[in-house]
Design a protein with these regions (language model features):
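Residue-identity detector for threonine
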Residues: 33, 66-68, 79, 118, ...
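Asp-based, Mg2+/Mn2+-dependent phosphohydrolase catalytic module
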Residues: 1-11, 105, 121-227
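N-terminal helical cap/lid subdomain that shapes the substrate entry/recognition surface
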Residues: 2-110
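Residue-level marker of regulatory loop/turn positions in helix-turn-helix DNA-binding domains and
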Residues: 96, 117, 149
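Conserved phosphate-coupling serine/threonine residues in phosphotransfer and NTP-handling enzymes
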Residues: 18, 118-120
């Protein structure tokens, strides 16, 4: 399969913001958790607005985000917050971004090996996928924050290439955050940015992502594929 004219033998996907519509419920879930702990809600709206304006570079995991929102919290308090937040997420899981399941099914039917690379922990990822009707066995490898190396470490994708031994220049990573771009660059893997995670086009352009490699959402890949 060729994407943008280049031979691709492996597609690696982020999860939140690429497959799952985290924007559809993140604000609500954060607010519910903040209310439980008596924390300010104003910083949540400001944080999301800053991301949408491209002012904030986020790392894509709950612990770092909690530190950013409420820097006065101790490590123990952050742990409490994250644990409760994950309970809230599990009660109110994120839905699929329109077209994401269809493109995954298309790639599977075409025989394209796929992998996941996310900064979720595995236990969180598994119930996220289950709630969305996605079988983890569809993916040849999965990298989470439980791995020795995770985004943006240069060796993040090593377990994926151990499972699917293709040249790195024939792999493609699709992500929704600047940290995903960093990871792809460090690993020597081609990158496509999607805007469905809330980071604006101009932020990716500022990072150096090619304009035609920035898409609204994952299923736009169909428009640049050649079988």
């Amino acid at each position: 399969m060729r994407i943008f004219g280049s031979l691709v033998e492996l597609v690696i996907l982020d999860v939140d913001g690429v497959i799952l519509d985290i924007l559809g419920g993140l604000h609500k879930n954060l607010e519910e958790t903040a209310v439980h702990f008596g924390l300010s809600l104003d910083v949540i709206a400001q944080n999301i607005a800053d991301i949408a304006l491209g002012k904030l570079r986020i790392r894509g995991n709950a612990r770092d985000s909690t530190h950013t929102l409420w820097p006065h919290l101790s490590e123990a308090e952050v742990t409490e917050f994250v644990d409760f937040f994950e309970e809230v997420e599990r009660r109110s899981p994120y839905g699929l971004i329109p077209g994401s399941l269809e493109i995954i099914s298309f790639l599977r039917d075409a025989g394209m090996p796929m992998a996941l690379a996310t900064n979720n922990h595995m236990k969180s990822l598994l119930w996220r996928l289950e709630a969305a009707g996605i079988d983890p066995s569809w993916f040849a490898a999965i990298v989470t924050k439980d791995n020795r190396y995770f985004k943006p470490h240069p060796q993040t994708f090593d377990p994926i290439f151990a499972a699917v031994p293709v040249p790195r220049d024939r792999a493609l990573y699709v992500g929704d955050l600047q940290i995903d771009w960093d990871t792809a660059c460090e690993a020597g893997v081609s990158f496509i940015a999607v805007l469905s995670g809330g980071v604006p086009r101009r932020a990716f352009l500022h990072e150096g992502v090619q304009a035609d490699h920035i898409m609204n959402r994952l299923n736009n890949l169909l428009e640049c594929m050649e079988l």
